[in-house]
């Protein structure tokens, strides 16, 4: 029988000092036999996805206390990728994932907490907390802040839905008037919550459902809707049950590594491919799997991508649907239901509610459930009122979207595409693979060949695109922007958005060892591995080289002979200390970022730290 971790600090005369300090936080004699549960919050006023979380930790804590536990809240940092985008701030985004994971480990282990409720939401916060949860392997439940309502505005006498990416594209389009650009900017992000499309934050919060670590509805129920409050109340109650099951009944099925098993990781990636999730999820699932000591690699993702169809299409891949529409169609469980009926899921998995996948689908899939309360929850919709307050409205759709032929979520027979929304490509400068969000690629450019235009920083590429130096047919190559080379593996949302604003969204390709925002669409290929800074062949590409992209056959090829590439590699190595570095780039890199770069691995490893360099 495992002993409560917290007993280390609450039992025995030699812990009198620790108990004295616990008393100063409000604990009493009656609390010293109870489980201590960390409420891991991520409230900040910097990020719309987190601005409403201030009081939600208290909400969870009250339920923990009522259920017989002791709740202790602490906060992590949270970087807003959209605000950090397009300048030096983006260098810090991916490294913040490791800091978040480490900070959770530090707090939980330093104070011997028994379990956690993780209140996350945006791009690196959910992955960081997920990595920490699987590293620590103590009972955990995730409950995120929820998606933002889609923006709406009237253009050309038509009401259209908007999000952050629309504001960026309009702002950079010289053909758009100042007044229209300002109108879109003011309408794009109307409420608190994670940006309204299937971007990285919402993708990851959906994946926690498929991993079994959060409750049904977590990924899609709007931040502003009153129904979302119940997820927080349930999390507080349920975590005490899970904790007691493990520590008092020796039930290891309550632990995250036994819930988020390899089978669950395969289900999560299957969901990701089917819903056309952000390419960043590949990085984060690979990183989380390593923390869980699960053998889940790019090879597994490649195999899944070849057999899983695209059953859901959401912004940025279409303007028609946003997360509020996914929820109305049954949310994550709705997609999982269709995947299960297609025979594409591992069924022998459980979630934090203790339900198997078939039990979860029976109760929560709107196509089959007889539970009116569940159907009512999935009718939760937007209010269209600007707010930063959680649970501030209770509007409902008149009907559910259960049309699996033409609705937001489709059945296998009516899939948007027989190929899934993500694909792994391999070739002579991506020997370890690269990732493309096929959900956002127009059919006309699934096969594309063009001359390379090579840039050694995102800034240079942006300048060239806006300066008209990139033309239809070009393949833009941005290198030395990987985890080590950036450092920090910047997102390339500005270059892809500016290609669209210049009318080149369906006429050019962009390839990088960096990564893309979940808001990216178009022929955007990232995570090229190995990265240039690690000696990857992307560092050997020269202006004018022809690059052939073949998504249907999962290929990407630099049309240069092996002999020529060998000669270029020899010349690169001859640069000595300057080898595999940009020839010219002005960039201030802090000590903190250099420390991150010194341990960073390429994207095919999840951009995690190289433990071998530390002897572990």
From Swiss-Prot:
Mg(2+) binds at residues 81, 123-124, 491. Coiled coil: none annotated. It is an enzyme of class 4 (lyase). Keywords: 2Fe-2S, Amino-acid biosynthesis, Branched-chain amino acid biosynthesis, Iron, Iron-sulfur, Lyase, Magnesium, Metal-binding. GO terms for cellular component: cytosol. Binds 1 [2Fe-2S] cluster per subunit. This cluster acts as a Lewis acid cofactor. GO terms for biological process: isoleucine biosynthetic process; L-valine biosynthetic process. PROSITE patterns: ILVD_EDD_1 (PS00886), ILVD_EDD_2 (PS00887). [2Fe-2S] cluster binds at residues 122, 195. Pathway: Amino-acid biosynthesis; L-isoleucine biosynthesis; L-isoleucine from 2-oxobutanoate: step 3/4; Amino-acid biosynthesis; L-valine biosynthesis; L-valine from pyruvate: step 3/4. Its EC number is 4.2.1.9. SUPFAM superfamilies: IlvD/EDD N-terminal domain-like, LeuD/IlvD-like. GO terms for molecular function: 2 iron, 2 sulfur cluster binding; dihydroxy-acid dehydratase activity; magnesium ion binding. Pfam families: ILV_EDD_C, ILVD_EDD_N. InterPro entries: Dihydro-acid_dehy_C (IPR042096), DihydroxyA_deHydtase (IPR004404), DiOHA_6PGluconate_deHydtase_CS (IPR020558), ILV_EDD_C (IPR056740), ILV_EDD_N (IPR000581), IlvD/EDD_N (IPR037237). Belongs to the IlvD/Edd family. Functions in the biosynthesis of branched-chain amino acids. Catalyzes the dehydration of (2R,3R)-2,3-dihydroxy-3-methylpentanoate (2,3-dihydroxy-3-methylvalerate) into 2-oxo-3-methylpentanoate (2-oxo-3-methylvalerate) and of (2R)-2,3-dihydroxy-3-methylbutanoate (2,3-dihydroxyisovalerate) into 2-oxo-3-methylbutanoate (2-oxoisovalerate), the penultimate precursor to L-isoleucine and L-valine, respectively. This is Dihydroxy-acid dehydratase. It comes from Escherichia coli O6:H1 (strain CFT073 / ATCC 700928 / UPEC).
